Regions:
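Acidic, polar-rich low-complexity tracts and alpha-helical solenoid repeat scaffolds
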Residues: 2-6, 13, 21-308
């Protein structure tokens, strides 16, 4: 089960599948005209508002001029893409590059092939093609989109937290890279939003495993999982429960100062949470109160992320 039900729509909006053309400065992107080389900046990307309206980064589905040798191959691949024959389209764009490697359309064909692979759910092939585009054309004006396509291809593959989450980690790495490489762009904004969900998913996996260990009375193993959430995924929705579980587990082990610290940090940051109410009640059964030990790893980990 994927967590990104709307991500395909988002990518289509970014890639601009309208046939009506594009009124933005990016009308030549991929489909509006032949390759013109580098842009020197990713700042020409559309605003997030444009992405939501579907008017930014419009493909335009520009065809190659019939007088060009590449025209027949490229335009046939483009036609297949428009009709939804994505596998055939990908092969057609690959053939454009193979037969006309020095054509101004060959560069664009690589990314069009990557997009076609993505649309047929061929995520690994889409990633490989986009990575190849980046390797061959690192300074191209469309390189930011190639990075975005890679990230979304990983993101689409995120599975239920009961499954292996290695692809989620790859998605998060790719999404974070976009934010670092292309800040202040619509790509970065969307990547940041998706990264929040990816981190929450990884935290959910840690909690799932931690609860299992707790149920099996493997308390130290459970603590390590909850500890990971507090240290690595502190800003996710799973943190209140992780702090409660630490209270519960340390209490069961008789490590009361850590149990009290976990409850105190929980109460200070989520005072209205049901998890805090449960933690407080648990401590009261032993005649204890939430008290933060500043030397506790919990206190130090929290201060490292939220100082002050």
């Amino acid at each position: 089960m994927k967590i990104a039900a709307f991500s395909r729509f988002a990518l289509i909006v970014v890639f601009g599948l309208s046939l009506a053309g594009c009124s933005t400065s990016m009308s030549d992107l991929l489909g509006g005209g032949p390759d013109t080389g580098t842009s020197g900046s990713a700042d020409s990307t559309a605003s997030s508002g444009e992405l939501k309206r579907g008017t930014g980064l419009n493909l335009g589905f520009g065809q190659a001029e019939e007088s060009e040798p590449v025209a027949k191959l490229y335009n046939k691949a483009l036609e297949d893409l428009q009709k939804g024959y994505y596998r055939t389209a990908a092969k057609g764009f690959d053939e454009v590059e193979r037969q006309h490697p020095y054509s101004q359309w060959a560069t664009r064909a690589i990314l069009m092939a990557a997009y076609s692979q993505y649309m047929r759910n061929g995520y690994d092939d889409a990633i490989n093609a986009a990575e190849r585009f980046i390797t061959l054309h690192p300074g191209h004006k469309d390189t930011p989109y190639a990075y975005y396509l890679i990230a979304i291809s990983y993101y689409e593959q995120i599975m239920d937290i009961k499954r292996d989450q290695s692809v989620t980690e790859k998605a998060l790495t790719a999404l974070d890279e976009i934010s670092v490489r292309f800040p202040n762009t619509a790509y970065a904004q969307d990547a940041a939003n998706k990264a929040i969900l990816a981190r929450d998913h990884l935290a959910g996996k840690e909690m799932e495993v931690g609860r299992y260990y707790l149920k099996e009375n493997s308390l130290l193993a459970a603590i390590n999982r909850f500890k990971t959430v507090v240290i690595k995924y502190q800003t996710t929705t799973h943190t209140p429960e992780a702090l409660y579980r630490l209270t519960e587990t340390y209490y069961a082990l008789g490590v009361m100062n850590e149990a009290q610290t976990a409850a105190a940090v929980l109460g200070a940051n989520y005072p209205s949470s049901d998890w805090y109410k449960d933690a407080y009640s648990l401590l009261k059964t032993g005649g204890l109160e939430p008290v933060e030990n500043k030397d506790s790893w919990i206190s130090k980990a929290w201060k490292a992320v939220t100082p002050g």
